[in-house]
Amino acid sequence: IFVLTGHQLKLNSQEEKKFLTLKSEIVNVRQGHSFDYPIKFIYRKKNLPVKIIDVWENFKKIQDYDNNQGWIHVSKLSKRKAAINIKNNSIIFKKPTIFSKPLARLEKGRLVLVKKCKNLWCKISDENYTGWVKKEFLWGKF
């Protein structure tokens, strides 16, 4: 007699929308939910946001902005806030209003750190600028 039991943990409604970021510069993504599974691909981008779509013990199944999926050990994930700009030429403003001074433009796909969010705006930073971008133009953890 075989009895199959599922160890998979069901995501609650908050986790379904949860994002985390990559803790290290290099992170292995596996085909399954243990170190026994082969590496599917490797991320080489610290702070890259990933969406959590499933959980199995100490592994989380993630999906990135380009819809790539795989499993990452929890030790390689962080709660640091970061996002990807999803609109070409988003404007970074000095204050959270379109009537504020424009500081720069963000190209689509640009990774930014998120300092805080206020209503429809997020204060972000990259290597060159710190300012406010509309939240609707960001994908990730904030």
Where are these regions (language model features)?
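Bacterial N-terminal signal peptides
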Residues: 1-6
